[in-house]
Amino acid sequence: MRIFKIVVLTKRSLILLITIFIFLLFISISLFIKINLLPANTFADPRSGIIVIDPGHGGVDGGTNKDGILEKEINLDVGRKLRLFLEQKGYKVIMTRDEDISLEALDNSAKSRHQRDLNARVNIINNSNAQLFVSIHVNCNLKKPSTDGAIVFYNNKYEQNKSLAYSIQKALNNIVVNNRKRTVHNPVQAKYFVLGNADIPGVIVETAFISNKSEREELVKGTFRENTATAIVSGIEQYLHESTNVSSPGQ
């Protein structure tokens, strides 16, 4: 014969158990949010279509250069073309700079001019309520001038960074120079300041190697810059389609 014990909870015990349950539930939810979710301003409306373009360098900072060709000028022109193509598709674009200037005057929190410039770019990105950002740069490898191709850099701070990097890299790898494809690269994980301090997904795109003679000749051509901007747009839209399943604003 089985004997069943009946446990009778007092009102005080019941309240205590409910309190403990609610506390544990709260802790679990808090940990889930902390581990899996991005900062609040990352969750911009996926249909808002805001994208930040960050043309690197500018003003007193010319960036890398070769044979009188300045990186800062290429970055700005590619950035403007990228803005045009994105706006034609219905996106709203915010530029960190739209002229030949550096941005250190917008920040006074550091002694170094270079650091103030970087801080200003991060502040613009983080206050944009954008879905993502793309920083435009030009690469250089004087020790191995034969190196060519576009390379996309990302930080592993957010999982979305890697997805965005791979989408843009895939599109850039298809650009043809002088009737041949350039070296196919994979995205590279990096700890650049802008990537590590941005509160939204983003990448740095090194469009080509100014140290490579063939690519240097292409970098000054409007067609190459347009093809680069077009490829970046394609990568952005592929990323947005895969991550949010939302059509571009113009569709």
For each of these PLM feature ranges, what is it?
Residues 1-251:
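Catalytic-site microenvironment of enzymes
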